[in-house]
């Protein structure tokens, strides 16, 4: 009998498991894959601590970035945390002031740069491909290092990790009593589901409806390269957020339980990040498909990513790399 069971070993699940174990609870973390396959496996690793727009989210941003700055020392393993520039590119035909107004409520206000100023800050940018950019201070971690560091620290404190699939939650009467897995039952009165995009199907199998959704995210990873990208680059007008907002209508919620639907056409948010070991990840193409196991034409996807990225980062769009994909969860409340 454990005090807590955490389902899902991505950045959310492993962070929570570590903090609970550190607080003195007995914790079992259950993760399906020894090599992560969800959003934590393909994220850029950016920390948008500037983005808080309410008193609560601003407090979370303030406390969160302070925590990130000290974690490597506490864990004894480098998460590769660093402070970098974030450049949110503005399309050539967009109104910079209108784009800027979308960020007026942020905890830290951006600096509006014209195209030449943005290219001075990030020489890899194509001045003819942008109308300017918004500059933010930004945090960045290597998600693989972050998860690995927490995993080792969690286990040193006595936490347990089991790699198996959770089939459903165990409910007796009106009480949650544990989980049923491919390795049998594990008991606890406190279960936290941190399974990302797979949370919806897990909760449904347990008789619980939830408004959790997902996109199919696709990006390209390179090997370490000599080319240098100083900043994290992303679009100021992110199409993925528009996709998410357009697919969470409560009247259409049931369609997410029927595989085979494409709710909106795919879109690309052109951006890139270079990691400390000089690998570059660029993308991101997003699809809204109701089947988490849908087959995707990787050749077509890679071509679409390269076409859009090459418009703003031409040298990066031409780099050799490996196409990858994962599911990225989102909720109905913009969180």
Give the label of every model feature segment:
Residues 45-121, 267-270:
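Dinucleotide-binding Rossmann-like beta1-alpha1 core, especially the glycine-rich loop
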Residues 134-189:
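Helical element adjacent to the flavin cofactor pocket in flavoenzyme catalytic cores
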Residues 5-7, 179, 186-198:
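Short hydrophobic core segments
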Residues 22-41:
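Glycine-rich FAD pyrophosphate-binding loop
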Residues 59-62, 88-96, 133-152, 295-301:
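Short beta-strand to alpha-helix junction loop
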Residues 18-19, 47, 79-81, 186, ...:
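Active-site substrate-recognition segment that forms the wall
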